[in-house]
Amino acid sequence: ADVSYGINKDCLLPMDVGRCRAKFPRYYYNSSSRRCEKFNYGGCRGNANNFHTLEECEKVCGVRSRDSPKEN
């Protein structure tokens, strides 16, 4: 079954850290867990599944935040 209906196609791209070696904290949508998760972005290349904040990722990818625990 195709569960990708109604979701932004950028959110279905695999997580891509890019070719550079910086470590910028970013978020991507994990289509397996259906959640936005943190990763370290290298700073160049990569793809569109790359968001500056958890909130932005959840908004664009339509994640229903059901009282998700805040990261400390």
From Swiss-Prot:
Taxonomy, superkingdom: Eukaryota
Protein name per its UniProtKB record: U-actitoxin-Avd3r
An example Gene Ontology CC term for this record: nematocyst
Gene3D superfamilies: Pancreatic trypsin inhibitor Kunitz domain
PROSITE patterns to which the protein is assigned, alphabetical: BPTI_KUNITZ_1 (PS00280), BPTI_KUNITZ_2 (PS50279)
Species, as recorded: Anemonia viridis (Snakelocks anemone)
Localization per Swiss-Prot or TrEMBL: Secreted; Nematocyst
Family annotation (SMART domains): KU (SM00131)
Family: Belongs to the venom Kunitz-type family. Sea anemone type 2 potassium channel toxin subfamily.
